[in-house]
Amino acid sequence: MNRDLRFTALKKTPFHSRTSLASRTNKYYNWNGFTVPTEYSTTELEYTAARNGTSVMDLTPMCKYMINGSDANKFVDYLVTRDLSQMEDNTVAYIIWCNEDGKVMDDGTIFKFSNTKFMLCCAVKIYNWLHDSAEGFDVSFEDATDTTAALAIQGPTSCSTLKNYGADDLELLKPFGMKQYNINGYDVLISRTGFTGDLGYELWTDPANAENMWDSIMEAGKELKIRPFGMHALEMTRIEAGFIQTNTDFMAAEDSLRPVRMRSPYEIGMGWLVHLNKESYFVGKRALKKEKETGNSERCLVGLDIDGDKPAVGSVIYNEKKEDIGIVTAAMWSPTMKRNVALASLKRPYGIKIKENTVSYTHLTLPTSVPV
């Protein structure tokens, strides 16, 4: 019997002509329907560039949504758990948003241009959900993923590289600040943001400018040993920094087939982003307030020190009674810390917070210890 199998071809980013030439491994990854390199040369060299020099990564596949309208500020305030009432124009904020049950839909960054114009960047496609949530608000949405080319320029020499590129006075840009530049005759938005835990910036421009931007930045960083880096190196840096990743360290509520897979902000270390005292209502506020008051969070996300040097991703964690108490969600050997480190989701009371941003020391056998 013949079967008609249909596949959707992966799209190429505006930087593909350059990233494909730079890749010596031909290893690629499907990121939101785009093909991007997982590794250009070796992950170790790319990681080293991110930690000691300048690294460049194609961020174009990241979901990008423009939010416009007279109620844009009010809608964003309704959408996210964080109080953004004091957020200034031309700044960026790290945010999470939940469903009405207080379970995390995704995390991301919100760029504020004015009270009537924002850009939301995140890992999971939420265009339809934004529309469904906006009933009663005077707002419109544009999926800008395909119409905005983006690069991450990360590492301790990233500022010097971008100044060579033409971003004058970039050293004055504060963390989570953003500024519009005109470089080589085209507009470039530069934000001091990133996913490596190091000094870094993200650049946003029209796709027509992508190849010139790539070539110019690579030339600007030539003396600073600039190097492209792929998804594997990014994974290493974000684990070291303790940054969470949707559908890796937790399942997005909309993607979870079973409620038990969903997580609240308090269960993934994001309680500091939940501002229950903000005056306006936000999606999930009632459920999160109840969870906070009753203390009935079932799990927590913690960092681990792993004995030995064997990969620990997906490993089950047991207590002294050989009972399953959690699972390792992400792990790596850290060249910087010279340790085998990991992130893990544990059942409470293991790893319960005792102070804001602090967790208790929980020592486990088999063969993992949990200080965070």
Question: Could you describe each region identified by the protein language model?
Answer:
Residues 70-106, 158-188:
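Internal amphipathic helical hairpin motif
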Residues 1-24, 30-31, 38, 112-364, ...:
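Conserved, structured C-terminal
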Residues 56, 86-88, 97-103, 108-114, ...:
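Short, charge-rich binding segments
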Residues 61, 71-76, 93, 104-109, ...:
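Generic hydrophobic, aliphatic-rich segments that mediate packing or membrane embedding
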Residues 1-95, 103, 232:
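Acidic, proline/glycine-enriched N-terminal capping motif
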